[in-house]
């Protein structure tokens, strides 16, 4: 069959794989359609847009007001598996919460690894930038260390809730993440930094188990009736979250929108934007889909 492949009648596309992508060639006659991000312009001045999001958040007072009077802070960030511009996001957040009176020594940046490996050394610098790595306490979550977690009871569907104690004990709780389609939670971002991000293996084992994953609503782009989304939202609210800062990226991984504020309201604002640029429909069933997320 390989000898019958005619490159002149093929189409070429690049899948998001690794850091540089993976180019593949397919017989043009077999391709029904290529689905891509709809046209969306990256932010012309992302720093100014982020500053505006922090000053005019959705569902909460401005970040500096939320932080005023707090004695300590824990900021959750995604690990190296997510293309989040953490340094760009963290710098104004750190600046504002210190202006509000929280000492640098009372701030913990916690990498929400879930059950992924820790990000250390050069990888940690790549994640947050040299300046932040050198001057702030940046630590990894270890989901398989039960002594690092605090028990908060059970969720409505019986998920045991064990959350990283460093986050639970912080006076100000902030999550920083990325909103994009997710294969089981509907969309990433928002509540996912807490569960599974800083949950223990005992929590993740149930939440990420077949009882939830096999549900027909636990799928990409679906929030309504999705038990995975509903459970980790409930768990995140139980753990507490004072403020979120989430980014939406374009197809070149450039910031297209920032949302900030209330964990649910700001997240849903970001989801609405993502839906407007990524949701599309194939007109008929196909035999095979090549998907990169």
Identify the role of each PLM range:
Residues 2-52:
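N-terminal amphipathic/basic leader segments beginning at the initiator methionine
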Residues 40-67, 267-278:
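Short N-terminal or domain-adjacent regulatory/targeting segments
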Residues 58-74, 101-104, 239, 279-288:
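Glycine-rich phosphate/diphosphate-binding loops that line cofactor/substrate pockets in enzymes
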Residues 106-114, 246:
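Short internal beta-strands
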Residues 121-133:
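Short, aromatic/basic amphipathic alpha-helical patches
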């Amino acid at each position: 069959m390989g000898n019958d492949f005619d490159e002149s009648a093929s189409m070429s596309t690049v899948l998001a794989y690794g850091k540089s992508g993976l180019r593949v060639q397919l017989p043009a006659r077999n391709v029904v359609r290529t689905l891509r991000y709809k046209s969306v312009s990256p932010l012309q001045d992302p720093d100014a847009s982020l500053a505006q999001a922090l000053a005019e958040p959705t569902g909460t007072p401005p970040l500096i007001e939320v932080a005023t009077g707090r004695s300590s802070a824990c900021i959750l960030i995604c690990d190296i598996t997510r293309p989040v511009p953490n340094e760009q996001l963290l710098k104004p957040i750190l600046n504002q919460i210190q202006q509000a009176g929280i000492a640098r020594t009372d701030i913990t940046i916690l990498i929400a690894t879930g059950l992924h490996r820790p990000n250390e050394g050069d990888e940690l610098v790549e994640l947050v930038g040299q300046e932040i790595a050198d001057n702030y306490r940046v630590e990894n979550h270890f989901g398989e260390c039960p002594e690092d977690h605090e028990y908060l009871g059970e969720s409505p569907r019986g998920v045991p809730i064990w959350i990283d104690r460093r986050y639970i004990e912080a006076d100000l709780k902030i999550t920083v993440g990325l909103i994009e389609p997710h294969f089981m939670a509907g969309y990433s971002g928002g509540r996912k930094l807490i569960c599974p991000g800083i949950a223990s293996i005992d929590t993740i084992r149930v939440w990420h188990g077949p009882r939830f994953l096999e549900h027909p609503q636990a799928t990409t782009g679906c929030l309504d009736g999705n038990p995975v989304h509903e459970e980790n939202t409930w768990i995140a609210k139980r753990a507490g979250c004072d403020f979120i800062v989430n980014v939406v990226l374009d197809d070149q991984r450039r910031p297209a929108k920032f949302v900030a504020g209330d964990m649910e309201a700001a997240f849903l604002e970001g989801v609405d934007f993502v839906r407007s640029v990524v949701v599309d429909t194939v007109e008929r069933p196909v035999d095979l889909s090549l998907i990169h997320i």
